[in-house]
Amino acid sequence: MKKLLLGAAAAALLFATPARADITVCTWGTITGPDALVNGMTYGTADYLKYLNESKGGIAGEKIKVLMLDGRYKLDEELKIYRRCADQEQAVVINGWSTGASKALRDQIQQDGIPFISESFASEVLDPEKYPFTFIAGPTYEQQMIIALRDLAAKGGKNVVLMYSDNEYGRGPVNVVRDSGVIDKLGLKLVDLVEYRYDAQDVTAQMLRIKAKNPDLVYVQGSTPQLIVALRDAAKAGLPTKLFVGNMYNISPAIPEQLGAAAEGFRAIQTYSFFGDNIPAMKEIEEYAKKNEVEKKDIYFIKGWLKGKVIAAAIESAIKKAGGKVPADIKAFRKSVRDEMEALKDFDTGGITPPFTFKDHQGSVQARVAEIKDGKYAPVGTWINAR
């Protein structure tokens, strides 16, 4: 198992190469903490860049220095890590984590001029004109929610409950969808908004309240740990699992593993291929795994591998534009990487998503509904455009 080296900021440092740091990439996530069940995307990005170091000698003959850091899902820790990456480490690209940190940093990122890929799918950090250095890697939380609402409307359902955590990750997307009027436009009725503590270990009271509303759909804007609690207590309250739909961060093997039969029928929005699918990117992962341990074998690792591909492609293009050498001016290098990331067109993701163009800073917006059947997630619909 990879060893975590904890510094003064309680940050985990992995994969730092001894080579000169001409190309430094920082990626942070919840390596330890309440959201650790979905941290495969942090490992995936770091592992892809390590894969390039091992298989191709890095980028343009230069090894990539990769810092994988632990933000512990604490805003103050994430802000400290950002400053470390931007200033001391002179990172050319930063891959951040939470919605709260991404929103808190969104103006600073533009001032610093550092390409920043957020793990958050919040629409409030996605604006190529206002936030030209910020990117995400898939449909926004709001777009994912609307897919579930469209699916309900198409099936003749009516009553909707939106359940969400008491933080930026939970409230922000729910407020955007509620205020957009899309629920009414689809002929649906919002019968309740139910908030819960992000670290709650019991939501039975909320489930009894939801049961009294007799909904046709309960959309949960929460991460995997919260979904496990919600579905467990829904079963106690006599609410069918099939009523519940979650976002991309609810496609975790931990849900059926921990809940067993109580997870059957739960649905979530799928935005990437599954780990183990017969796609070219999986062949790369298998090659990497011959010499290295892959700790996170899930869809989040696949997302991370995709982000690694995007980061590497943008850096490689920037170096080519500079005559094949790493630019000495870090500000100019960062700006060029940002420009090349935005310029990615018909980008081949190795089957993780359809080829995409990154001009909108979002990449692929393809998504579909997946349902837990016999303990595993299985697609129950075709890929659709989330816009």
Residue positions per predicted region:
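Extracytosolic ligand-binding ectodomains
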Residues: 4-10, 21-387
